[in-house]
């Protein structure tokens, strides 16, 4: 039996190294695609971000062809997602549960799911909302990244609460429905 030539060994070593590097790069990109921080950032450390142009409201076109002013006359909870982000389904469900609880209790706040991928169609987003059993959740496509830039949101699965004055009072990754409700109450709901 003959052993492989030195050239064949080097070729195999290069191929293995290239595959390992490709796997590491793929893993890094996959992990960074969805936020993984499950702790809420304290308002004191993050509330100041995204407030430079906070006094002026943006009118957002919703998927149901209505509009919503953000910030409006009541606190707003905005959840940034993409249909392709598996982790985002849980955060969107939490947003919908918080919206239903507020509605049932007669409390006033705006709830908005913001799709960060401008290439996803209205139909795809509606199917996603149906899939997570939140078909009534108000949603929009962040065309031109207007909302994500204004509020400095770079990661999927990020939820922010914006007070009526325009100040971001809460920022977290995939918070629970209770955490969203508490943050909205602190913002004046």
Swiss-Prot record:
Disulfide bonds: none
One Gene Ontology cellular component annotation held by this UniProt entry: extracellular region
Location in or out of the cell: Secreted
Domain of life the protein comes from: Bacteria
PTM statement from Swiss-Prot or TrEMBL: Predicted to be exported by the Tat system. The position of the signal peptide cleavage has not been experimentally proven.
InterPro entries for the chain: TAT_signal, Thioredoxin-like_fold, Thioredoxin-like_sf, Thioredoxin_domain
GO process terms (BP): response to mercury ion
Keywords linked to the UniProt accession: Mercuric resistance, Mercury, Secreted, Signal
Residues of the signal peptide: 1-27
Record Pfam families: Thioredoxin_8 (PF13905)
Domain (Thioredoxin) ranges: 38-189
Function summary: Probable mercury binding protein.
Protein known as: Mercury resistance operon ORF3
Species, as recorded: Streptomyces lividans
């Amino acid at each position: 039996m003959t052993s492989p030539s030195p050239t064949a060994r080097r070729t195999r070593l290069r191929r293995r190294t290239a595959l390992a590097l490709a796997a590491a790069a793929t893993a890094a990109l996959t992990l960074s695609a969805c936020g993984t921080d499950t702790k809420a950032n304290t308002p004191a450390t993050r509330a100041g971000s995204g407030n430079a142009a906070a006094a002026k409201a943006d009118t957002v076109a919703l998927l149901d062809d209505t509009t919503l002013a953000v910030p409006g006359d009541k606190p707003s909870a905005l959840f940034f997602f993409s249909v392709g982000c598996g982790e985002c389904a849980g955060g969107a469900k939490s947003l919908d549960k918080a919206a239903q609880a507020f509605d049932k209790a007669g409390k006033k706040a705006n709830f908005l799911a913001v799709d960060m991928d401008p290439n996803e169609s209205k139909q795809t987003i509606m199917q996603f909302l149906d899939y997570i059993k939140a078909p009534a959740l108000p949603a929009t496509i962040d065309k031109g990244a207007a909302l994500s830039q204004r509020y400095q949101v770079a990661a999927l699965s990020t939820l922010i609460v914006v007070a009526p004055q325009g100040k971001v009072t809460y920022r977290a990754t995939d918070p629970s429905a209770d955490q969203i409700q508490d943050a909205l109450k602190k913002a004046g709901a």
